[in-house]
Amino acid sequence: MGNFIFENYGGIEGLYHVQPEVHSDARGYFMETYNYNDFKKAGLGMVFVQDNQSLSAKGVLRGLHFQKEHTQGKLVRAISGEIFDVAVDIRKGSKTYGKWAGVILSAEKKNMLYVPEGFAHGFYVLSDTAEFLYKCTDFYDPSSEAVIMWNDPA
């Protein structure tokens, strides 16, 4: 049933803006937020092993996080509010190493971003509050966690 539009984003290999099909009527709406078969057809046949959710106030900046070991691919979306989401390619040897892309994700638009393994990821809250949900391809490992400052000149 799930129909998704997958758009390579920012000219960065593996980074995808994802728009699910939303079925709306007088009662409200229904949508699939993930369907393994649809994602696999789009070349994104990853398996998610952990879901995380956060609530942040306006002006909060989270990130840019990554894990040196146990790298995580992430499918991220705002389930309330609006955020400016950023992914930075930190894959050594990548044609787009150091390149970043940002997109506004909102509960209203219901859009998502797939951030592949080997990227740093973060977001900035634009609305009064925002709830953020992300599916991960590997488990959180505090001993592997690292961060890049948002204003790092490199």
PLM regions and their residue ranges:
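Non-catalytic, conserved peripheral segments adjacent to functional cores
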Residues: 1-108, 127-129, 136-154
